[in-house]
Amino acid sequence: MFSRVFLVFLIFIFPLAYGEDLRTIKPERVGMSSERLAKIKPHMQRYVDEGKVAGIQTIIARNGKIVHFEQVGTLNLDTGSEMKHDSLFRIASMTKPVATTAAMILFEEGKLLLDDPVDKYLPAFKDKKVLVDGELVDATHPFTIRELMSHTGGLTYGIFGNSPIDQQYREAMFGENNTFNFRNIANNDTPESQLKTLDDLVAAIGPIPLQYQPGTQWVYSLSVDILGAVIEKVSGQPLDTFMEERLFQPLGMKDTFFEVPKDKLNRFGTLHTIDQTGKLIVVDRPETSDFANNVSFLSAGGGLVSTASDYIRYAQMMLNGGELNGVRILSPTTIDLMTRNQLTYDQQLKYDPRPGIAGTTGFGLGFGLKTEAPKTASGSKGNFRWAGIFGTDFWCDPKENLTAILLMQMIPYPQNVRAEFKNLTYQAITEMN
């Protein structure tokens, strides 16, 4: 069984009308083609037929109406149960935008400022040092809430690189002489995390030097997990309680949680990888998953389980400028702030250096952004998105009033499927805004 903390590091009573699903309509009513959208399902089926994934689910909404919702393949490889509209997925780092949105609720209430130093709320991060060319130097400034949200505060993840700071993170998470290696995933042989709560995380990495001076680089990191600890401190509530009361209930997200309830386990699938022989195998099972058994580590960076129907409500709220079905979560001005680029041009080039993409992609508060229309891919300037390590992905296109979600449970996932799904979505548009 995978450790829950390992999985999430990879990588988050109202009136009945609030819980209603977004209405499904004929695509032609919102400038899309039914015939062209029909290309998506057989394309995804090929991935299943070739044994590259167990199952895939896709959902698309335009102008606030669902125009496509399909799934192919198997939810649970052990039982053979099929994927359905209400299937539950480990959404991994798609948790990050949701948690950042929760923090912005506190921002709007005047309970925190984006330029507040993190050590104002979490003293373990006071007086940080930075490791520069093997020497410890003082940080130029305390890293801030904004730098947590934009992954520019000097933190790292510890599991994607091999710098001296990465090594210290791994020791803090998995112990000295740990055997962590992504190649071990296929053998279901990953080390157990020592960290059981957000407080454990803060205490463990608080003393570790920063990897770079705050504000100078973009490095994907545990920042949003630390933001989760800030949310708990400022709100005075556990992270799951705050997010349930302030986000999930108001938006009608009845199937989004950090721990899968026992009565919903039959809708929660297996997690998969490809073993050394090329065979699709199970590496996490619903009945033994740490996403379903006495969850104590509430990972704002990757701990949520959700459905396509729930997550598209969140995405549509963001696309609507902070409101869904008459329920306002945030002001349009706050959504605008969250989707502004926080990176310098040099940081953008390092953030996504791919040919044709470099310099057109930035990062806001919780989201990757398109600062320019891409030259080699579908999409519009102003798109915002994020994804997860198990093959989950979503994006919002304000120009075309379009949002789409791709869900699977695969590590590693097929690299091209996200771009292919995006192209298949945009080719179905017949009337541009």
Regions found by a protein language model. Name each.
Residues 2-8:
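Sec-dependent signal peptide recognition
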Residues 10-18:
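Hydrophobic h-region of N-terminal signal peptides that target proteins for export
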Residues 393-395, 401-410:
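Short, well-ordered beta-strand elements
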Residues 73-74, 287, 410:
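A generic structural motif
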Residues 38-44, 64-66, 89-118, 224-232, ...:
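Active-site SXXK
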Residues 21-91, 111-113, 126-135, 415, ...:
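Short, conserved catalytic-motif segment at the N-terminal edge
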Residues 33, 96, 307:
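Short, conserved phosphate/pyrophosphate- and ester-handling motifs at nucleotide-, phospho-/glycolipid
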Residues 129-378:
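Short, surface-exposed loop or secondary-structure junction motifs
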